[in-house]
């Protein structure tokens, strides 16, 4: 079976992410469900920190929201948080990931084994690099459409 991909169509172009169910099957299933339901369509990157990461997936754009689905059990794994890695955001409680995720701009080893890695950018990282910066950005970049193939 071919690797499944998540495509985030941004205003500037497509970001193609290789999904990693071998690392985090529950998290990958959630991402696929939400993308299939159109949950991510129109959602912004509400927290974009240069040299660190771009975070999105909050339906209200504040960083405080999530889907109506139950929070996920942590699936911390050995994959390192390096440039292009996609990982799930959460509160200080390990089992609180829901819909928000982040994409690393740079290596962030202090996150390793504390956040669930579920994918890696295969192409289009330049579009993540170009997202407006800020917490939140004055004019945040957004996901036009998220699709799984």
Regions found by a protein language model. Give the residues of each.
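Cyclophilin-like peptidyl-prolyl cis-trans isomerases
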Residues: 1-149
């Amino acid at each position: 079976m071919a690797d499944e991909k998540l495509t985030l169509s941004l205003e500037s172009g497509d970001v193609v992410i290789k999904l990693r169910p071998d690392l985090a099957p529950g998290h990958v299933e959630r991402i696929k469900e939400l993308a299939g339901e159109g949950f991510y369509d129109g959602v912004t990157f509400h927290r974009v920190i240069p040299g660190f990461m771009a975070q999105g997936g909050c339906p209200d754009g504040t960083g405080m929201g999530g889907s109506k689905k139950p929070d996920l059990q942590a699936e911390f794994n050995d994959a390192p948080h390096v440039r292009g890695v996609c990982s799930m955001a959460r509160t200080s409680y390990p089992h609180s990931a829901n819909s928000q995720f982040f994409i690393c701009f740079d290596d962030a080893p202090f996150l390793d084994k504390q956040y669930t890695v579920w994918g890696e950018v295969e192409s289009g990282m330049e579009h993540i690099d170009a997202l407006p910066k800020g917490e939140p950005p004055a004019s945040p970049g957004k996901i036009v459409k998220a699709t799984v193939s």
